[in-house]
Amino acid sequence: MKIKLPFWMDKGELSKIAVLFGKWWDYVLSAVKFPFNILDEEHCSERILNLIAYQRDVERFEGEPLELFRKRVKYAFLNAKDAGSKAGFIRIFERLGIGYVEIEERFDRENWDVIKIRISDSQLAKKTELLNLIIRKYGRTCRRYTFEVITKETVSIYHGEFNHDHQSFYVKVN
């Protein structure tokens, strides 16, 4: 913090005192911000992150990147709040960076407890453990989940105009 003095006071001992107060306020500000910075999930040390994760009941699965673990810890409360609804489940997938997801419920009359999750093949291949963890942690109890792979394919349709006359002749057979 730089303290700006009027031009007639900006010389000598007063300018030294202004610099001293600027440094002191920077120290006080850093001391006030320290508790908030130490609990920031995106920037804290990995040891503190593990303590926060324990507090929020988030376990790191094997081979999970640190950045994804930080996201899971950061959004643990929101994910728990959104669990159980179709729109909330889609928001969980978006927050954790999985991407576009479709969810269909009660599509079968006999197996009404099955929930179908439609995702792309690359999402399923790259994030299998994360998908299983999300379903196990935030999925509904007494429900079964299936994955259905959707593939994006570009289709070209050409159209044109075709003018013609049409006549029909009917014959009555006795």
Swiss-Prot record:
Its main location: virion. InterPro entries: Tail_protein_I. It comes from the Viruses. Keywords: Viral tail protein, Virion. Pfam families: Tail_P2_I. It is found in: Virion. The keyword Phosphoprotein does not apply. One of its GO terms (cellular component) is virus tail. Induction: Expressed in the late phase of the viral replicative cycle. Belongs to the P2likevirus gpI protein family. Putative tail protein. This is Putative tail protein gp30. It comes from Haemophilus phage HP1 (strain HP1c1) (Bacteriophage HP1).
